UniProtKB/Swiss-Prot annotation:
The active site is at residue 96. Homotetramer. Forms heterodimers with either ThiH or ThiS. Pathway: Cofactor biosynthesis; thiamine diphosphate biosynthesis. The lineage of its organism: Bacteria, Pseudomonadati, Pseudomonadota, Alphaproteobacteria, Hyphomicrobiales. Catalyzes the rearrangement of 1-deoxy-D-xylulose 5-phosphate (DXP) to produce the thiazole phosphate moiety of thiamine. Sulfur is provided by the thiocarboxylate moiety of the carrier protein ThiS. In vitro, sulfur can be provided by H(2)S. It comes from Rhizobium rhizogenes (strain K84 / ATCC BAA-868). This is Thiazole synthase. InterPro entries: Aldolase_TIM (IPR013785), Thiazole_synthase_ThiG (IPR033983), ThiG (IPR008867). It is found in: Cytoplasm.
Amino acid sequence: MLALYGTEVASRLLLGTARYPSPAILAEAVRQSATEIVTVSLRRETAGGRNGGAFFEMIRTLGVRILPNTAGCHGVSEAVLTAKMAREVFQTNWIKLEVIGNHDTLQPDVFGLVEAARILASEGFEVFPYTTDDLVVAERLLDAGCKVLMPWCAPIGSAAGPLNLSALRAMRAHFPDVPLIVDAGIGRPSHATTVMELGFDAVLLNTAVAGARDPAAMAGAFAKAIDAGRLAFTAGMLEPRDMAVPSTPVIGKAVFA
């Protein structure tokens, strides 16, 4: 089980709800993924008007927990205001905090992120910060009151997969007791398996599933890949060696003179 701010979930796959071909396909992807947590943008809920309300009701019928996000926010005050509005709309203290610093890469503004996290944590929010793999920033976020970290492995929507395995490995080693959820940049199930084999606690997906030819089938593929990576990590994988090691014992081998 994975514990996030005192809530335990069995699934280690978190699923975004944007960019699906239709609500019905999204619903089936959620079912096939077996996720227990979906992210929802306040902008999607409010901008859709009556349709936005129908979307929210559809999500609620799936029996999953909603993690609102501040997607599209480019400053501290905007992110904080959006988080407060999301708490009212979705009736939860959970917030996936995004403060974007660059339009092209959608890289987090880590300075604004830490400031916004501190403000929100002081007001009772349980913050899931979208951040980089920088250890110093991670320390600042924990100091600000975050109990979960969500580092990217590549730019949002890039499908590039983990670009810096050394940094991700270092983050896992440096924060052995902090829930770490890889957020952004995953493109293939094998990417998800790779980061789970490093010991990360979960993966958040959106574009890799929503943009697939068959989103529901891809959601199922990712669910299996994440489970496989987690099982491999807990089972204890062999470390690579430079030289061969025979797999067949030589004791008792016949000797022909």
